[in-house]
């Protein structure tokens, strides 16, 4: 019975783990945890949970996608594009478009 409960819990956690850090698509981590479950940037839907928002869309320039996310979420502390983290200088450029608090 205990094994069944653990298996069920692990199965339920899988979608959240996959959403946390997509290998394809984009992931944005704002300085302040998102207060919305979903958001749209232009025509890109994002899902937010925990400390980040993710989308599986791969179209568009990574810098543009980062700037659009920052415009909605505020200053980002991390951004990944197709599994690759933005270097500090790219993140700083992205955050020039961050919404004011």
Residue ranges and their predicted role:
Residues 1-21:
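Classic N-terminal secretory signal peptides
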Residues 22-99:
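Post-signal/leader-peptide non-cytosolic segments of secretory proteins
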